[in-house]
Amino acid sequence: MQFTLEFGGGLELLCDSVKIHKVNINLLNDSDILTMKDLLSWVRTNLIKERPEMFMKGDTVRPGVLVLVNDCDWELSGQLDTTLEDKDVIVFISTLHGG
Amino acid sequence: MMSNGGDSSEIVRELEELKLKKAEIEHRISTLEAKLQDTATVERYDAVSNGDSYLTAPELEHGLSPDQIYRYSRQLLLPSFAVEGQSNLLKSSVLVIGAGGLGSPALLYLAACGVGRLGIIDHDVVELNNMHRQIIHTEAFIGHPKVKSAAAACRSINSTIKVDEYVEALRTSNALEILSQYDIIVDATDNPPSRYMISDCCVLLGKPLVSGAALGMEGQLTVYNHNGGPCYRCLFPTPPPTSACQRCSDSGVLGVVPGVIGCLQALETIKLASMVGEPLSERMLLFDALSARMRIVKIRGRSSQCTVCGDNSSFNKKTFKDFDYEDFTQFPLFAGPLNLLPAESRISSKEFKEIFQKKEQHILLDVRPSHHFKIVSLPDSLNIPLANLEARLNELTSALKEKEDGHVNTGSCTNPSVYVVCRRGNDSQRAVQYLRESGFDSAKDIIGGLEAWAANVNPNFPTY
């Protein structure tokens, strides 16, 4: 399955300062589904190059990170249980405080 | 330069005096102008009562005066805004918290468009390094309160609105009283404890909150606590780790980025105040200046579990007043100096100057990020950023070894000391703490960093 993953608000610094990643993730077998929980652990293993604690806490994202699946807050689609589909766009954004 | 010291301090003193006088005169002018306008209105009414109605302004149901019709004509001509929108705007009151990068453009537009009453609160003074983004301030106000400067600018654009000045910090002790006087609150602050405090206060008072943030090349904007929408805590129930909270003064920001977000804050405020359009509630605008992308995303609604606005919340005015927001976020409301080390592990910038002059053997370690080091640095300093110190400790060891070897030849027997410097004297303390734990017992931090060096030793040393 193909996904577009975007990192913003400083989170891109954890993956070599690259903001947009087009990735291909293969399912183990055809009947399997891919959830946000699976995607997070894939991201942590494959994309996060430094300070993983700045991205995750436990099995979810750290406080202050918004997760958007197709421009929609993942709270509205089931958080970690959100089922992903081919060509979904997932955005991870750290909240800003400056001004 | 030294011989002119007396002259220049005299000039500076006179300049300060003149600037203060100028601000006072400007304030007096706008007060008088407002007064004149009121008198003119009364005179017109007098004319009506004398029966010369064909010579006077017609009495208009919307209550706009002829001057107001002329001033705001371009807004009145908008079918979707029109006279109702303007009339609502003139009756509304808005409090802008923070007269910095976000507050500057927001205040300019809010004053210009005719918000009836505009409150400005900020505890800070105008500095030269604010000017690139805090466009409401002028050089004449450097060293003066931002609120005074911003209020003068607002009055000079629109002398007919009421501008309230609060030259103080917003705290739990004064927040309820100040915020309660306004219809709409604009969060233009720069730190997590303020953001939680302002949102909680808006929930308690039932006020909509127009919240903007900007850092580096990115910005974010949303409207909280409006029409059943979420509050800040619904979105961020747990504060982020301190290491994820950066200030513009530490991480940098391109001036126009908060400018864009501040303008959009003004826009959302105008929409709320005039009751026109669709506010950015339950949605968030994300702005990425580098890639020229602006996306609007759907965010969650109000959380019934929210500790402040939720169904079973016991949060009240008393809880608010006693709440320690700095402790909750582990982040200071105001940037202040850290105090990690005992006195014997520290030296002042003046003491370090003597070491420099006496040519005592030492290593000067600068722990700022390398792009800071490139802006300016002290001569003969070794740059190892704090973040890499552990990994690059061998560079310090070999630099020390080199000095020691050089020393053997000169016959001296004292070991070279390590002095650590950074921009303001916080990271240097963290570095010294780490170095002492790693066996560098001579490590000392230079109190106040390069800013103290510039203030106390070399006034020609650039600060940023």
Curated annotation (Swiss-Prot), chain A:
It is found in: Cytoplasm. Pfam families: Urm1 (PF09138). GO terms for cellular component: cytosol. This is Ubiquitin-related modifier 1 homolog 2. Acts as a sulfur carrier required for 2-thiolation of mcm(5)S(2)U at tRNA wobble positions of cytosolic tRNA(Lys), tRNA(Glu) and tRNA(Gln). Serves as sulfur donor in tRNA 2-thiolation reaction by being thiocarboxylated (-COSH) at its C-terminus by MOCS3. The sulfur is then transferred to tRNA to form 2-thiolation of mcm(5)S(2)U. Also acts as a ubiquitin-like protein (UBL) that is covalently conjugated via an isopeptide bond to lysine residues of target proteins. The keyword tRNA processing applies. SUPFAM superfamilies: MoaD/ThiS (SSF54285). Pathway: tRNA modification; 5-methoxycarbonylmethyl-2-thiouridine-tRNA biosynthesis. Keywords: Cytoplasm, Isopeptide bond, tRNA processing, Ubl conjugation pathway. There is a cross-link at residue 99 (Glycyl lysine isopeptide (Gly-Lys) (interchain with K-? in acceptor proteins)). It comes from Arabidopsis thaliana (Mouse-ear cress). It comes from the Eukaryota.
